Amino acid sequence: MRFPNRKLHTAVNGGDSGVSTHFRNPFVHELRFTTLQKLKIAVMTVTLFPVRLLFAAFMMLLAWPFAFVATVGRSENAVEPLSWWRWLVDLALKAIMRAMWFSGGFHWVRVKGRPALPSEAPILTMAPHSSYFDAIPVTMTMASIVMKAESKDIPVWGTLIKFIRPVFVSRSDQDSRRKTVEEIKRRASSNGEWPQIMIFPEGTCTNRSCLIAFKPGAFIPGVPVQPVVLRYPNELDTISWTWQGPGAFKILWLTLCQLHNFVEIEYLPTYTPSEEEKKDPALFASNVRRIMAKALGLPIIDYSFEDCQLAMAKGPLRLPKHTCLLEFARLVRLLGLKTKVTDEVLQEEACSARQLCGRRLDMEGFAQYLHQPMTEAVQDIFSLFEEHGMMDVREYVIALSVVCRPFRYLDTVKLAFRMFEAQEDGAIVEDELTVILKTALGVGDLAVSELFRAIDSQDKGKITFDELCSFMEKCPDLVEQYHCLCESISQHSRESTSSSNGFCADFSPRNHSKKQD
């Protein structure tokens, strides 16, 4: 796959977000420290960090008996009138939680806008979701949230969670999704009797460089929602907790080492859905997302929680941060191709591609190969692979295998060998290995000469699938170890820009620079 230089259509779903379409990989977060910042962190680690950590733990322990007493004898399926002593417990818990956040450096929490009453907006939609620190507005409002059922069994934390009456999702119950939606609808239709439900519709954490696709759960009830946007206007972003980046404890450590941590919570006007939006939760979600993106000054892009699997996949062919396979996955999903892909379908695609014997297709030929009309999405997919107006459909099949089977890299490599290998000995040459790895990683440039020579220990000028697999077992990080990506990364870094909150690598295969109309 390659990075076309031409400017293409944005990934924004229908409308003006009022911002530049210069996207970054939302699932990747990197931190780069200056020497002075490293020195500051070192000093804070042995002075302020342990004090803050101990005090925060103490405040959580202090909150536990209040939450425990308040939940004793309380019905899980009905809401009783709030008694005076439970009201006092609610105030005490809010004060304790605020003290805990204060001890962590969140000295000022700026709140803009007017929070709606539960009767006005039973659901709060909050974005962008970037960290466990997004719990700050939850503890300030004591609104209900949607959480996995296993959370209530965690000592101390589980009791605090049960106090806010969350909607629990059970991973072991295959019918859990339907039950969760029904419970949200039941509470949202209670005319303000239940506490508001605070939902993060993105469904996963990102680096706040854009708003990804909203899940429809918050919008299926068809009731008014209040959009709430979060900002962390810090000089250094130690908040973001993404699929590729610092781990949970490192984020906690670095954040507690900052002298001040700023957070802004802005309540936007309540959004009442139209009759059309009530019938179409996806449209409802899209329109709310557009309003939130405009308030944040961020682009919107149709990546989803499912795309995180690409970022999570481990192994020798772990995707680099600047891969354009995320864009490919979005386009494939847009065409409805991903749901139709099975192992058998991929094998059939590979056979069809091999029968072309390396013959390259133009855009019309590619559309016919996909059995799709000539749409914008088909043109965008073609642009990811084309060189001089032609493409090798084998590259498309490899990319399709990666996005549909992100955790089965060996199956993808085996499929690629089937399409490229010589019939007499099942081997491929260096140029073919380059194409396979470039496509499987979703990059535009790759240096594999050193890697190929290492695999081809007998200097035959070709390698087999078994030889590559054997080498992968000995060298699980072969792409990084043999510096295959160094040239591509350096070239891409020169084209990338860093954000004010840390460094987030660009991933789009396009040079997004035009404004949306």
From Swiss-Prot:
<keyword id="KW-1003">Cell membrane</keyword>
<dbReference type="InterPro" id="IPR011992">
    <property type="entry name" value="EF-hand-dom_pair"/>
</dbReference>
<keyword id="KW-0812">Transmembrane</keyword>
<keyword id="KW-0808">Transferase</keyword>
<feature type="short sequence motif" description="HXXXXD motif">
    <location>
        <begin position="129"/>
        <end position="134"/>
    </location>
</feature>
<dbReference type="Pfam" id="PF01553">
    <property type="entry name" value="Acyltransferase"/>
</dbReference>
<dbReference type="InterPro" id="IPR002048">
    <property type="entry name" value="EF_hand_dom"/>
</dbReference>
<feature type="glycosylation site" description="N-linked (GlcNAc...) asparagine">
    <location>
        <position position="207"/>
    </location>
</feature>
<feature type="short sequence motif" description="Di-lysine motif">
    <location>
        <begin position="514"/>
        <end position="517"/>
    </location>
</feature>
<feature type="domain" description="EF-hand">
    <location>
        <begin position="443"/>
        <end position="478"/>
    </location>
</feature>
<keyword id="KW-0551">Lipid droplet</keyword>
<keyword id="KW-0012">Acyltransferase</keyword>
<protein>
    <recommendedName>
        <fullName>Lysophosphatidylcholine acyltransferase 1</fullName>
        <ecNumber>2.3.1.23</ecNumber>
        <ecNumber>2.3.1.51</ecNumber>
        <ecNumber>2.3.1.25</ecNumber>
        <ecNumber>2.3.1.67</ecNumber>
    </recommendedName>
</protein>
<keyword id="KW-0333">Golgi apparatus</keyword>
<dbReference type="GO" id="GO:0003841">
    <property type="term" value="F:1-acylglycerol-3-phosphate O-acyltransferase activity"/>
</dbReference>
<dbReference type="GO" id="GO:0005509">
    <property type="term" value="F:calcium ion binding"/>
</dbReference>
<feature type="topological domain" description="Lumenal">
    <location>
        <begin position="74"/>
        <end position="517"/>
    </location>
</feature>
<dbReference type="GO" id="GO:0047192">
    <property type="term" value="F:1-alkylglycerophosphocholine O-acetyltransferase activity"/>
</dbReference>
<keyword id="KW-0106">Calcium</keyword>
<keyword id="KW-0677">Repeat</keyword>
<keyword id="KW-0443">Lipid metabolism</keyword>
<keyword id="KW-1208">Phospholipid metabolism</keyword>
<comment type="function">
    <text>Exhibits both acyltransferase and acetyltransferase activities. Activity is calcium-independent. Catalyzes the conversion of lysophosphatidylcholine (1-acyl-sn-glycero-3-phosphocholine or LPC) into phosphatidylcholine (1,2-diacyl-sn-glycero-3-phosphocholine or PC). Catalyzes the conversion 1-acyl-sn-glycerol-3-phosphate (lysophosphatidic acid or LPA) into 1,2-diacyl-sn-glycerol-3-phosphate (phosphatidic acid or PA) by incorporating an acyl moiety at the sn-2 position of the glycerol backbone.</text>
</comment>
<dbReference type="GO" id="GO:0005886">
    <property type="term" value="C:plasma membrane"/>
</dbReference>
<feature type="topological domain" description="Cytoplasmic">
    <location>
        <begin position="1"/>
        <end position="52"/>
    </location>
</feature>
<dbReference type="GO" id="GO:0005789">
    <property type="term" value="C:endoplasmic reticulum membrane"/>
</dbReference>
<keyword id="KW-1133">Transmembrane helix</keyword>
<dbReference type="GO" id="GO:0005783">
    <property type="term" value="C:endoplasmic reticulum"/>
</dbReference>
<dbReference type="Pfam" id="PF13833">
    <property type="entry name" value="EF-hand_8"/>
</dbReference>
<keyword id="KW-0594">Phospholipid biosynthesis</keyword>
<dbReference type="GO" id="GO:0042171">
    <property type="term" value="F:lysophosphatidic acid acyltransferase activity"/>
</dbReference>
<comment type="similarity">
    <text>Belongs to the 1-acyl-sn-glycerol-3-phosphate acyltransferase family.</text>
</comment>
<keyword id="KW-0444">Lipid biosynthesis</keyword>
<dbReference type="GO" id="GO:0047184">
    <property type="term" value="F:1-acylglycerophosphocholine O-acyltransferase activity"/>
</dbReference>
<dbReference type="GO" id="GO:0000139">
    <property type="term" value="C:Golgi membrane"/>
</dbReference>
<feature type="transmembrane region" description="Helical; Signal-anchor for type II membrane protein">
    <location>
        <begin position="53"/>
        <end position="73"/>
    </location>
</feature>
<feature type="glycosylation site" description="N-linked (GlcNAc...) asparagine">
    <location>
        <position position="511"/>
    </location>
</feature>
<dbReference type="InterPro" id="IPR002123">
    <property type="entry name" value="Plipid/glycerol_acylTrfase"/>
</dbReference>
<keyword id="KW-0472">Membrane</keyword>
<dbReference type="GO" id="GO:0005794">
    <property type="term" value="C:Golgi apparatus"/>
</dbReference>
<dbReference type="GO" id="GO:0008654">
    <property type="term" value="P:phospholipid biosynthetic process"/>
</dbReference>
<dbReference type="GO" id="GO:0047159">
    <property type="term" value="F:plasmalogen synthase activity"/>
</dbReference>
